[in-house]
């Protein structure tokens, strides 16, 4: 399994700094979509900056829900493992790998986002989200 490029504790410290600034709120950070170059090729992937800074997770199709002071505090949604797609698109951590390597409190498949996210956000006083940055996740 591929290791994260930095120690996950660095990202935990960054999230702790943010937590002190937004008590009772949540942050939702979706990954940037992949940019298609032509019908069967993509441009090199670049993660959304805030997600990369706070989670260190560099795969497309992901979303971080960060809820400071709540249980679970860090919930990551990722693309599931798929050996066939990995042959063409490259390595994927999947649900188990993301939890093991990055230390998120909970990890779900991105396919479960619409079902799980409302329950995660219902008790939050505010939700921070960048509007109009990613049409796929609006």
Spans of model-derived segments:
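A composition/biophysics-driven feature that prefers long, compositionally simple stretches
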Residues: 1-138
